[in-house]
Curated annotation (Swiss-Prot):
Pfam short name (any one): Gamma-thionin
GO cellular component terms listed in the entry, alphabetical order: cytoplasm; extracellular region; plant-type cell wall
Protein name: Defensin-like protein 18
The keyword Secreted is annotated on this UniProt entry: yes
Database matches in SUPFAM superfamilies: Scorpion toxin-like (SSF57095)
Keywords noted in UniProt: Antimicrobial, Disulfide bond, Fungicide, Plant defense, Secreted, Signal
Purpose: Confers broad-spectrum resistance to pathogens.
Annotated compartments: Secreted
Secreted is among the record's keywords: yes
GO terms under biological process: defense response; defense response to fungus; killing of cells of another organism
Family: Belongs to the DEFL family.
Taxonomic lineage from the root: Eukaryota, Viridiplantae, Streptophyta, Embryophyta, Tracheophyta
Amino acid sequence: MAKFCTTITLILVALVLFADFEAPTIVKAELCKRESETWSGRCVNDYQCRDHCINNDRGNDGYCAGGYPWYRSCFCFFSC
């Protein structure tokens, strides 16, 4: 009986050790940033920009950015 328990324990330990090697590899998609083609005016709210990029420009994400704080544009992220 002790031999059986030892064998089962060793098998379970081996399964746990080798389970880590079987983990799937996750590949992150490259995202490219470009200014929204359909946004008009200055961008003040990141949430509105993100919503606009996803719904109108079919992007993955978006946020307000730009060189001057008083005039920022909406930039969208797309899969490259």
